[in-house]
Amino acid sequence: MDHRELWPYGLRVLVIDDDCSYLSVMEDLLLKCSYKVTTYKNVREAVPFILDNPQIVDLVISDAFFPTEDGLLILQEVTSKFGIPTVIMASSGDTNTVMKYVANGAFDFLLKPVRIEELSNIWQHIFRKQMQDHKNNNMVGNLEKPGHPPSILAMARATPATTRSTATEASLAPLENEVRDDMVNYNGEITDIRDLGKSRLTWTTQLHRQFIAAVNHLGEDKAVPKKILGIMKVKHLTREQVASHLQKYRMQLKKSIPTTSKHGATLSSTALDKTQDHPSRSQYFNQDGCKEIMDYSLPRDDLSSGSECMLEELNDYSSEGFQDFRWDSDKQEYGPCFWNF
């Protein structure tokens, strides 16, 4: 396959500018980026073309056409009917002008002369628009399923690294992270274990926080894997994985809390020091895992064979691998955190 058939090569861009000379310059620059270019010098001719052929236009770049409002006309027509990302360009761009176009739906505002580096990255606007549409329609899980067109991310990943431009390669990584962020709900919680993008489960800081929140909610006597799993509500996370994590969590607590109180609860030396300084303060892990443990243990019952699950070979359960959040009530800052079990 010709590498120019791979995305973002072949991106279909419609350019509108009443300055014929600059329209030719823009066409040359876009062709150098391996985009397919259609040009119009009149907005009122371009709009009917877009309305008749929305499927062959990926992005519109339009001059602002000062002092008329033609730029706003095409912006409103295109965005309201088809949601095609539109970029406005102009020779000058005061704050009020930029705000006017952005408020009316412009994805970007470019100052003339437009640099080729800016044009080589305009595909990001299409990418973000596609991801936002899927997010709004709750279709993130269907991006790669049969019956749906391949997502832009999939096409970008399919492009061999040797054929990607430097700008494309550099900009793809943060956008992949953007996609991953879209697969977490608005509260920042993980809702599907597959969204971690790992072939085997890794207990990330956020996933562990949700685990701790569930344990604290249930209390010492009722914190068993099945109930923890029910509260966490993470798709494809299994009871065995929770059981294994709970078991190793308890084992690590024993290692990190060697001193025994007269009531039978185990306290770390640090926790004891803090207790002496603030005898009325209760120390425990909150949902962010941000406090030390005091008078807290987990039940031994209902631990299944999950201790043999895949987490064991993937993660490190040594004392070096487990560091809890340290909460300084005076400084109000977090220390390091590695939840490697």
Swiss-Prot record:
Localization per Swiss-Prot or TrEMBL: Nucleus
Domain of life where this protein originates: Eukaryota
Protein name according to UniProt: Two-component response regulator ORR30
PANTHER family linked: TWO-COMPONENT RESPONSE REGULATOR (PTHR43874), TWO-COMPONENT RESPONSE REGULATOR ORR30 (PTHR43874:SF65)
SUPFAM superfamilies xrefs: CheY-like (SSF52172), Homeodomain-like (SSF46689)
DNA-binding region boundaries: 225-250
Gene name of the encoded protein: EHD1
Domain (HTH myb-type) ranges: 195-254
One MF term in the entry's GO annotations: DNA-binding transcription factor activity
Coiled coil: none
